[in-house]
């Protein structure tokens, strides 16, 4: 079986592997806490090709992002379906897709906490959400709601221009009572997003997130926050810095979000600054790759065998082979950094897999 794309090996299955009988004896030990929990906004990305008349009928400004009321969103979906204009329907929430990617790549269980429509028609967008989600994701704890989940329409015109239309539906109606404590007892991490903190003042989602965070801290489960977009951070930097300090173990961000949070344009310096509030930082920098920053015990730091890299922190990757440890668990904590370049230089073009999701996580 050949592997598509650029690879170092010609075949997916190595032809020089050890005796399979010996491999069975030397099985990899199972993790005691393999489950990842995520609190997410259940939303479906719906991509369709439309003409300009379609946009005018629904009063959509071409090339812009707009919010749709529910009745108009329903009518729009009906017409797209009846005229067979939809090209893709995939889960679109950051957390849901991060869990999906984890379950696929790690072949391990994850639990999604969110909402789902009580009545689902075969072939509908909610149906597609469930169909295109990994079977290793546990959806049994989803809170049922009377109404639609979120829908994000990407309407592509004949000239390639993209128009976005969003209807949040009931995606922010997750209540704190729907966060079960028992799933945290054998969990490896709780993953949340900055998107969950915005919405209407009456939405219960922020309270649900806070309950999940409190349960995670109670059971000593690391809390992972992906910043999602710089627009949520800008203007509220101080609040987010305090939130990270009080609640978060690991933060994932890109260079724009890092600059909004820390004021540092350089992703390495932004990651270094974020260590004031958290124990581990992941900062993606587009085609440049991924920077990581964390803490380790001074006595246990391990030097790299790779070339030392220049940067605003000289030879920053010197101890990149060190194991990351929580700062509070180190007697003499020292900062360690690493950089991962895109594999074989990265792809020639970026293609969508299953929608939004933090691949770095």
Predicted segments with their positions:
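Short, small-residue alpha-helix embedded
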Residues: 259-260, 350-361
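Gly/Ala-rich phosphate-binding loop of Rossmann-like dinucleotide-binding domains
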Residues: 103-104
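Ribokinase/PfkB-type carbohydrate-kinase core domain
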Residues: 1-65, 86-90, 94, 107-109, ...
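The feature captures the short pre-catalytic strand/loop hairpin that immediately precedes
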Residues: 75-80, 337-348, 358
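Catalytic-loop motifs flanking and including active-site residues across diverse enzymes
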Residues: 91-98, 356-361
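Active-site gating loops and adjacent loop-to-helix segments of metal-dependent hydrolytic enzymes
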Residues: 56-82
């Amino acid at each position: 079986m050949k592997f598509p794309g650029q690879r170092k090996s010609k075949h997916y299955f190595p032809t020089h592997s050890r005796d399979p009988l010996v491999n069975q004896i030397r099985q990899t030990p199972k993790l005691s806490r393999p489950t990842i929990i995520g609190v997410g906004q259940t939303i479906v990305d719906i991509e369709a090709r439309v003409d300009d008349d379609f946009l005018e009928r629904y009063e959509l400004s071409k090339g812009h992002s707009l919010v749709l009321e529910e009745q108009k969103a329903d009518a729009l979906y009906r017409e797209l379906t009846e005229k067979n204009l939809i090209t893709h329907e995939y889960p679109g929430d950051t957390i849901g897709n991060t869990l999906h990617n984890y379950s696929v790549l790690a072949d391990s269980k994850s639990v999604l906490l969110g909402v789902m429509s009580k009545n689902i028609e075969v072939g509908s967008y909610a149906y597609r959400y469930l169909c295109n989600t990994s079977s290793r994701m546990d959806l049994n704890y989803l809170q049922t709601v009377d109404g639609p989940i979120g829908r994000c329409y990407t309407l592509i015109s004949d000239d390639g221009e993209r128009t976005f239309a969003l209807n949040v539906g009931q995606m922010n109606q997750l209540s704190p009572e729907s966060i079960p404590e028992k799933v945290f007892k054998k969990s490896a991490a709780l993953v949340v997003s900055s998107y969950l903190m915005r919405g209407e003042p009456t939405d219960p989602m922020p309270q649900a997130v806070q309950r999940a965070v409190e349960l995670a801290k109670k059971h000593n489960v690391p809390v992972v926050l992906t910043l999602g977009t710089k627009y949520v951070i800008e203007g509220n930097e101080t609040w987010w810095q305090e939130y990270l300090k009080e609640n978060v173990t690991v933060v994932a961000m890109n260079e724009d979000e890092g600059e909004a949070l820390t004021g540092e344009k350089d992703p390495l310096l932004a990651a270094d600054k974020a260590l004031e509030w958290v124990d581990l930082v992941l900062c993606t920098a587009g085609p440049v790759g991924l920077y990581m920053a964390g803490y380790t015990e001074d006595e246990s730091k391990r030097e790299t065998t790779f070339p030392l890299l220049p940067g605003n922190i000289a030879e920053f990757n010197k101890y990149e082979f060190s194991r990351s440890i929580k700062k509070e668990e180190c007697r003499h904590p020292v900062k360690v950094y690493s950089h991962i370049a895109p594999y074989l230089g990265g792809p020639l073009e970026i293609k969508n897999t299953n929608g939004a999701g933090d691949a770095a996580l």
